[in-house]
Amino acid sequence: SAQRVRTADRGLSAAFDRSISDIGALRLHDPSGHRRPVIAAGAPWYMTLFGRDALISAYMALPIDPTLAIGVLEALAELQGRDVDLMSEEEPGRIMHETRYLGVEAPTLTGGSTYYGSADATPLFVMLLGELSRWGLDDDALRDLLPYADRALAWMQDYGDRDGDGYIEYLKTSERGLSNQGWKDSADGIRYRDGRIAEAPLALCEVQAYAYGAYRARAAIGVRLGEPEVVARCGQLADELKAGRLVRALIREA
């Protein structure tokens, strides 16, 4: 059951209660048979599982209901990319953008049941697992999810960083896919300072911040599990972003 908060400020208590109610209204049960909780992106048009939306919502809801984060991570782990498919933009280790459950008539953008065109869902997956570990996820559950997090980290370097410059960028591989693959995913959502629509490949500053968070999260998990090599490697990657790459990403404009 969700936590309840009572304060002397009735407005704050009412806002908290409304938030709990809204989360409950968007809560789904994964129909795969596991009956684990996940959260939809929004009603009525997005009443299904979206990677980015579910991960951020579950992260923010950790003080209320950590089981939601577990359900989201498990559901996304099962759908994690295994092969290279240009139409769905599936790639090994990539966390999907959206899925349509069996029985839902509307397909994804590219016509299949699952579409992977997201630059940020994959590092967010690792970030959420790291935060859930801090909130007391038991060792067995952590170890069950860890291989998926490591495959996500591998995607960030092998596929997310297409040109080896240290940034995660995106460029759609399907004509029907999303031109922009961050949270502003409308076709005209990303623009240069002069108003021109930015052309991919694009490396969004917030995605680089998520990458930093993912490396830090995996390093923290490595400390907990006694993995000194992982701690050193992920710590170095995070330090490199903080020392230079992330700063340049925030100020550079193509």
Residue ranges and their predicted role:
Residues 47-179, 205-208, 212:
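Aromatic-rich carbohydrate-recognition surfaces in CAZymes
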Residues 30-32, 179, 186, 251-253:
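Acidic surface patches and DE-rich sequence motifs
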Residues 7-29, 85-95, 171-183:
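An acidic intrinsically disordered interaction segment
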